[in-house]
């Protein structure tokens, strides 16, 4: 398969670089990795660390060295990379099999005081017990430059790259094939271009000859002045021109521009906004590298044909005993025909074994910069589509939920945050991997639908304390109580709408997998429907609590509250109406007592010592569901609904 025939980054570990200290950070890679977290949490440092290891940027002590590192603590980048069979110069002895990959582990260190870049390779069979150790006298791939060429190729797009730089890169990408063709034509003395350049040089010589008398007068005057100082010396002025070697690439770039059509209007790229320029850059980057890959594949195929032809010639000149020379000559003729067809632009024959090449690694900072929300969604789809290619991996840093899609296959989300306050506090990663979480039935499809309807769901990954709610009414009430009142909770919590009670259980699984502490409030609902049938939403109550207990067993702190029978009537309102979110918002905004009650509920969900809706003693004595049934029954009786079919006979619910 093609994805197994591309080098691929599997894991990256960074120590004592940028804001990352000696405790280090380990990032597991996937098709696409989204790095999230507050500013100065190490996201861009991760991208730069790969560039440092690959050698595309140089280690700068003042910029890259962790300020609090001790002198005996090296700055370090460790890569675990899949290096497929077929990539030359990396011996099989350095590879070990893991999850269908052939892994090579290499480490780059920068030690005080010189901070020279030193690479070592993990030998899987070294060490006292043969369980592996860092090799001391050799390394995979030999020379660093050779091994680096086998690694995935990084393409870095910074968040602050200016417009001029972007257009220059775009022009270079677009014109590179033409640059190559022009240089080939200039080096061929028989080409029209080479003859034209030679003609210009000849014309310059002719013009020089026509002005020879004037040149000689100047030469004599210079010589006379010079001999006045040094009588024994003479000087002559020789007029001529150096060979004309025009910088074709600069001439082309200075005269070229990219044009953007918008209906009937056509403008230069420099007249477009930053977002349009960045989006065009991503698109051209992908196309350029696909063309480059095609060129590499064709060159590799041609090299193989040339080798076959050379081998066949040798076997024909000195045939082994019993060899059918006529058959060899026919094979040689076919190989030469293939080479001729290939050089004429013919397609490469299909092969079950794709040639092995380094993959590409797109390192992009804050792709949301300067993009309209609609464009941001389109850009997200573009980047995820790019990551589906076996040639590409994408690692992005982002502060936008529009670029997070946790339910796309082969997606990893890593939140970087400091475990405590302080510039030297350790940075700890929380990792979510879409392929490692198991959903039941159509839960994943429901979550994908939720993500499409409301991309703000992905705010759960960005750092503040998430509170899960069923829908828009709770969201409106909570937002009114903290936004309109400018409550201190405004910067501490994120309200996440499930848009349906049945979505809460899979959302709890997401939180548990990502290891995020959270709060949850939902409706109790009635045990029965208006027709007397069992209410599926009542059954969800027990499922939700079971999921909450599983989250606690995984080490999370989760706080759980229930609205009896629903959030609208918890606020003192009527049963749900179509305008309930707006009504709830206005009600909480205008009623100070109600606003305070909602704030207290939110505070409980954030920091209460009681994590369950009921005390542990009450649950142990009576049971969770009997307590809930009792509360709902009591509410129904107090509100004149004791005989309502939805609430009676609850002992059988």
What do these predicted regions represent?
Residues 88, 92-216, 220:
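Electropositive, glycine-dotted interaction segments
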Residues 53-62, 289-294, 387-390:
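Post-Walker A helix-loop "phosphate-sensing" segment adjacent to the P-loop in P-loop NTPases
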Residues 47-102:
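Conserved P-loop NTP-binding catalytic core
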Residues 1-52, 65-67:
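Pre-Walker A-like glycine/lysine-rich segment at the N-terminus of P-loop NTPase domains
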Residues 1, 95-96, 146-148, 346, ...:
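Acidic, Mg2+-coordinating catalytic modules of nucleic-acid enzymes
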Residues 3-4, 165-170, 178-361:
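Extended helical coiled-coil dimerization/tether regions that scaffold
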Residues 355, 385-389, 393-396, 402-464, ...:
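Conserved P-loop NTPase catalytic core
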Residues 365-367:
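Walker B catalytic acidic pair
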